[in-house]
Amino acid sequence: MASGPEVAEPGDALIVNVGKSSIISVRDEDGAIRGFHNVCRHRGVRMSPEGARMSGNIVCPYHSWTYGLDGKLKFYEHMGEDFKPGCNSLKPVALRSIGGLLFICLSDNPPGDIDEMARVMEPYLAPHNVREARVAYQADLIEDGNWKLTMENNRECYHCGPN
C-alpha cells in the first residue's frame, strides 16, 4: 500500500485507495503504524481524499467527529444519552510493516501466513533499508492507454539506445 517513511512521524497520516476501499494509515504516538477504513462511523462520509496528508487527529469534514490516532472516537456532538462512543471507533484494517513496506489485508479474517511472508521477504528488502528512506520527490503521471502496452514496452529493448 505504501512505505513506512511516508508516515514517518507520530501524527502523520496517508490516505490510499485500494480498489473500492479508502484506507488511512497513521503513525501513532508510540511509533506504531495503524490502518483504518477512511469512513466516518457517523454518516459514512469519506474523511479525506486519496493522496491527502494530515497531521494529528483524524477529523470528519461533515460533522467534525474527531478520532485519535488509535482510531477511538474523541469528539462528537448531539448524540443521545445511550450513545456509546467506544462502539463508534474507526473500523481497523490489518496492516503490517515488512522491511519498511506497508501491507494491508481488507478481509475481516486476515490470513495467518503473514509471519511466513515477512520471514521470506525481510532478507530481500533489508539491503534497501526502506525503513530509513525519505520521500524526496513524488510525481503522478497519468496516461491514456492500455496498461498491458505500458508493461510490455518495458520488457523489450527496441527503444533502448544503441551501445
Indicate residue ranges for each PLM-predicted region.
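Rieske [2Fe-2S] iron-sulfur-binding subdomain
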Residues: M1-A32, T66-N163
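Glycine-rich active-site/cofactor-binding loop and its immediate structural neighborhood
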Residues: D12-P61
